[in-house]
Amino acid sequence: MSEKNKQNDIKVIATNRKAYHDYFIEETIEAGIELKGTEVKSVRLGHVNLKDSFARVENGEVFLYNMHISPYEKGNIFNVDPMRDRKLLLHKHEINRLAGYVQQKGYTLIPLKIYIKRGKIKVELAVAKGKKLYDKREAIAKRDAELEIRKKMKEYLR
């Protein structure tokens, strides 16, 4: 692999699969994340949980809440609170666009995945709208129907 391709590789650390089940994803955006030293080491080891995490725009800045980063085993006194609020790094125009979305009723910001890109830890943030119970049932029924069709086609082609 060439040096150029090696730098553009993306290594996914954690994904929020529940987000696709609970929300309609409208738009995604890549954001940097402000971490402490031992948090970076812990993230690189994959000790991250995105379940129930969300982001909020406050005073022209975006913060990520409820993201759990397990304390680094060898970090001793340098470890920080695993559930602390973390600042996301975005351009001002991106923050303004996200703030406009979030002010609309029903929209929220949720992290979809954390990955390493060119040595930097990034978060894929989504503007999402919550699904109602009947929407979830509808999605499950549609997925089951597609699965049934694939099975029948496979049977037919044998």
Curated annotation (Swiss-Prot):
HAMAP family: SmpB. Pfam families: SmpB. Keywords: Cytoplasm, RNA-binding. Its main location: cytoplasm. The lineage of its organism: Bacteria, Bacillati, Bacillota, Bacillota incertae sedis, Caldicellulosiruptorales. This is SsrA-binding protein. Belongs to the SmpB family. It is found in: Cytoplasm. It comes from Caldicellulosiruptor bescii (strain ATCC BAA-1888 / DSM 6725 / KCTC 15123 / Z-1320). Required for rescue of stalled ribosomes mediated by trans-translation. Binds to transfer-messenger RNA (tmRNA), required for stable association of tmRNA with ribosomes. tmRNA and SmpB together mimic tRNA shape, replacing the anticodon stem-loop with SmpB. tmRNA is encoded by the ssrA gene; the 2 termini fold to resemble tRNA(Ala) and it encodes a 'tag peptide', a short internal open reading frame. During trans-translation Ala-aminoacylated tmRNA acts like a tRNA, entering the A-site of stalled ribosomes, displacing the stalled mRNA. CDD domains: SmpB.
